[in-house]
Swiss-Prot record:
Name under which the protein is recorded: CASP-like protein Os03g0196400
Gene Ontology CC annotation, any one: plasma membrane
PANTHER family: CASP-LIKE PROTEIN 1U1
SUBUNIT field: Homodimer and heterodimers.
A family per Pfam: CASP_dom
Extracellular side: 60-81, 126-150
Cytoplasmic side: 1-38, 103-104, 172-195
Record's bilayer topology term: Multi-pass membrane protein
Similarity comment: family membership: Belongs to the Casparian strip membrane proteins (CASP) family.
Family annotation (InterPro entries): CASP/CASPL, CASP_dom, CASPL
Subcellular location: Cell membrane
TM spans (from-to): 39-59, 82-102, 105-125, 151-171
UniProt entry keywords in alphabetical sequence: Cell membrane, Membrane, Transmembrane, Transmembrane helix
Amino acid sequence: MRQQQAGGVGDGVSPGNVPVCYYGPGGRVPSSLERRARAAEVLLRCAACGLAVLAAALLGADRQTRVFFSIQKVARYTDMQSLVLLVIANGMAACYSLIQCARCLVMAYIVISAVAAAMEAALIGKYGQPEFQWMKTCHLYKRFCAQAGGGVACAIAASVNMVGVALISAFNLFRLYGNSNGGGKATTTTMAGGK
Protein backbone atom coordinates (compact mmCIF):
# COMPACT_ATOMS: atom_id res chain seq x y z
CA MET A 1 0.00 0.00 0.00
CA ARG A 2 1.47 3.36 -0.97
CA GLN A 3 0.50 6.82 0.22
CA GLN A 4 0.53 9.77 -2.20
CA GLN A 5 0.23 13.45 -1.41
CA ALA A 6 -2.64 15.05 -3.37
CA GLY A 7 -2.63 18.80 -2.91
CA GLY A 8 -0.45 19.18 0.15
CA VAL A 9 0.96 17.52 3.22
CA GLY A 10 -1.50 15.33 5.06
CA ASP A 11 -1.52 12.12 6.99
CA GLY A 12 -5.05 10.74 6.52
CA VAL A 13 -5.71 7.31 5.11
CA SER A 14 -8.72 6.49 2.97
CA PRO A 15 -9.81 3.32 1.23
CA GLY A 16 -9.05 3.49 -2.49
CA ASN A 17 -8.67 6.84 -4.25
CA VAL A 18 -11.00 8.93 -2.08
CA PRO A 19 -9.34 12.19 -0.98
CA VAL A 20 -9.61 12.78 2.76
CA CYS A 21 -9.43 16.42 3.81
CA TYR A 22 -8.41 17.70 7.21
CA TYR A 23 -8.93 21.37 7.95
CA GLY A 24 -7.15 23.49 10.50
CA PRO A 25 -3.59 24.09 11.64
CA GLY A 26 -1.31 21.22 10.80
CA GLY A 27 -3.95 19.62 8.60
CA ARG A 28 -6.14 18.61 11.55
CA VAL A 29 -9.47 19.72 12.93
CA PRO A 30 -8.87 21.98 15.95
CA SER A 31 -9.23 19.99 19.16
CA SER A 32 -11.48 22.65 20.73
CA LEU A 33 -13.95 22.32 17.84
CA GLU A 34 -13.77 18.55 18.09
CA ARG A 35 -14.47 18.64 21.85
CA ARG A 36 -17.38 21.05 21.42
CA ALA A 37 -18.90 18.94 18.64
CA ARG A 38 -18.63 15.78 20.76
CA ALA A 39 -20.07 17.54 23.82
CA ALA A 40 -22.96 18.92 21.76
CA GLU A 41 -23.64 15.49 20.30
CA VAL A 42 -23.65 13.82 23.73
CA LEU A 43 -25.91 16.55 25.12
CA LEU A 44 -28.35 16.25 22.21
CA ARG A 45 -28.38 12.45 22.46
CA CYS A 46 -29.11 12.54 26.19
CA ALA A 47 -31.81 15.19 25.74
CA ALA A 48 -33.41 13.26 22.88
CA CYS A 49 -33.42 10.06 24.92
CA GLY A 50 -34.88 11.76 28.00
CA LEU A 51 -37.53 13.60 26.03
CA ALA A 52 -38.50 10.44 24.13
CA VAL A 53 -38.92 8.57 27.43
CA LEU A 54 -40.93 11.46 28.87
CA ALA A 55 -43.18 11.65 25.79
CA ALA A 56 -43.81 7.89 25.83
CA ALA A 57 -44.54 7.96 29.58
CA LEU A 58 -46.89 10.95 29.35
CA LEU A 59 -48.86 9.43 26.51
CA GLY A 60 -48.77 5.87 27.83
CA ALA A 61 -50.21 6.90 31.21
CA ASP A 62 -52.80 9.27 29.74
CA ARG A 63 -56.42 8.39 30.47
CA GLN A 64 -59.53 10.18 31.64
CA THR A 65 -63.02 8.92 32.51
CA ARG A 66 -66.20 10.92 31.86
CA VAL A 67 -69.82 10.06 32.55
CA PHE A 68 -72.30 10.79 29.78
CA PHE A 69 -75.94 10.10 30.66
CA SER A 70 -74.91 7.52 33.30
CA ILE A 71 -72.53 5.78 30.86
CA GLN A 72 -68.83 5.83 31.68
CA LYS A 73 -66.53 6.56 28.76
CA VAL A 74 -62.77 6.24 29.21
CA ALA A 75 -60.41 8.15 26.92
CA ARG A 76 -57.06 6.40 26.47
CA TYR A 77 -54.14 6.93 24.16
CA THR A 78 -55.02 3.59 22.53
CA ASP A 79 -58.23 5.14 21.20
CA MET A 80 -56.19 7.01 18.57
CA GLN A 81 -53.80 4.96 16.47
CA SER A 82 -51.50 7.92 15.86
CA LEU A 83 -50.89 8.27 19.62
CA VAL A 84 -50.12 4.53 19.82
CA LEU A 85 -47.65 5.01 16.97
CA LEU A 86 -46.10 7.96 18.78
CA VAL A 87 -45.67 5.98 22.02
CA ILE A 88 -44.09 3.08 20.13
CA ALA A 89 -41.80 5.35 18.07
CA ASN A 90 -40.63 7.26 21.15
CA GLY A 91 -40.06 4.04 23.07
CA MET A 92 -38.02 2.66 20.18
CA ALA A 93 -36.05 5.89 19.89
CA ALA A 94 -35.25 5.92 23.60
CA CYS A 95 -34.13 2.28 23.58
CA TYR A 96 -32.13 2.83 20.40
CA SER A 97 -30.39 5.86 21.90
CA LEU A 98 -29.49 3.93 25.05
CA ILE A 99 -28.39 0.68 23.42
CA GLN A 100 -26.97 1.52 20.02
CA CYS A 101 -25.36 4.97 20.40
CA ALA A 102 -24.76 4.94 16.65
CA ARG A 103 -25.41 7.84 14.32
CA CYS A 104 -28.55 6.97 12.38
CA LEU A 105 -31.15 9.10 10.66
CA VAL A 106 -33.76 6.36 10.62
CA MET A 107 -34.95 6.97 14.18
CA ALA A 108 -35.15 10.71 13.58
CA TYR A 109 -37.35 10.11 10.53
CA ILE A 110 -39.57 7.61 12.37
CA VAL A 111 -40.12 9.97 15.30
CA ILE A 112 -40.76 12.97 13.01
CA SER A 113 -43.37 11.02 11.02
CA ALA A 114 -45.03 9.78 14.23
CA VAL A 115 -45.08 13.34 15.61
CA ALA A 116 -46.70 14.59 12.40
CA ALA A 117 -49.42 11.93 12.59
CA ALA A 118 -50.05 12.61 16.29
CA MET A 119 -50.20 16.36 15.71
CA GLU A 120 -52.79 15.85 12.99
CA ALA A 121 -54.92 13.70 15.31
CA ALA A 122 -54.48 16.20 18.14
CA LEU A 123 -55.62 19.08 15.95
CA ILE A 124 -58.68 17.12 14.87
CA GLY A 125 -59.42 16.39 18.53
CA LYS A 126 -59.00 20.04 19.44
CA TYR A 127 -60.84 21.69 16.53
CA GLY A 128 -62.78 18.88 14.87
CA GLN A 129 -63.25 18.51 11.13
CA PRO A 130 -66.63 19.96 10.12
CA GLU A 131 -66.29 18.87 6.49
CA PHE A 132 -66.35 15.22 7.60
CA GLN A 133 -68.65 15.86 10.57
CA TRP A 134 -65.92 14.93 13.04
CA MET A 135 -66.65 16.78 16.25
CA LYS A 136 -64.01 18.16 18.55
CA THR A 137 -63.48 16.16 21.72
CA CYS A 138 -60.92 18.11 23.74
CA HIS A 139 -63.60 20.21 25.42
CA LEU A 140 -64.98 16.94 26.85
CA TYR A 141 -61.62 15.43 27.90
CA LYS A 142 -59.59 18.46 28.96
CA ARG A 143 -57.04 16.71 31.19
CA PHE A 144 -56.52 13.94 28.64
CA CYS A 145 -55.91 16.45 25.86
CA ALA A 146 -53.59 18.54 28.02
CA GLN A 147 -51.46 15.52 28.91
CA ALA A 148 -51.47 14.31 25.30
CA GLY A 149 -50.38 17.80 24.24
CA GLY A 150 -47.49 17.64 26.71
CA GLY A 151 -46.46 14.27 25.32
CA VAL A 152 -46.59 15.54 21.75
CA ALA A 153 -44.56 18.62 22.76
CA CYS A 154 -41.89 16.39 24.35
CA ALA A 155 -41.86 14.24 21.22
CA ILE A 156 -41.35 17.34 19.07
CA ALA A 157 -38.42 18.42 21.26
CA ALA A 158 -36.96 14.90 21.09
CA SER A 159 -37.23 14.86 17.29
CA VAL A 160 -35.54 18.28 17.07
CA ASN A 161 -32.68 16.91 19.19
CA MET A 162 -32.47 13.80 17.00
CA VAL A 163 -32.23 16.00 13.91
CA GLY A 164 -29.45 17.95 15.66
CA VAL A 165 -27.57 14.71 16.33
CA ALA A 166 -28.05 13.70 12.70
CA LEU A 167 -26.68 17.06 11.53
CA ILE A 168 -23.61 16.75 13.76
CA SER A 169 -23.06 13.19 12.53
CA ALA A 170 -23.39 14.31 8.92
CA PHE A 171 -20.95 17.15 9.55
CA ASN A 172 -18.44 14.74 11.10
CA LEU A 173 -18.77 12.41 8.12
CA PHE A 174 -18.69 14.93 5.28
CA ARG A 175 -15.92 17.12 6.69
CA LEU A 176 -13.54 14.24 6.05
CA TYR A 177 -14.35 14.00 2.35
CA GLY A 178 -13.99 17.35 0.65
CA ASN A 179 -12.82 18.96 -2.54
CA SER A 180 -9.10 18.23 -2.86
CA ASN A 181 -8.48 21.16 -5.23
CA GLY A 182 -9.91 23.66 -2.72
CA GLY A 183 -8.27 25.15 0.32
CA GLY A 184 -8.09 21.88 2.23
CA LYS A 185 -5.22 19.45 2.17
CA ALA A 186 -5.90 15.92 1.05
CA THR A 187 -4.06 12.64 1.28
CA THR A 188 -4.89 9.80 -1.05
CA THR A 189 -4.02 6.16 -0.50
CA THR A 190 -4.04 3.80 -3.46
CA MET A 191 -3.88 0.04 -3.53
CA ALA A 192 -2.04 -0.13 -6.87
CA GLY A 193 1.73 0.15 -7.17
CA GLY A 194 1.89 2.72 -10.02
CA LYS A 195 1.66 6.52 -9.95
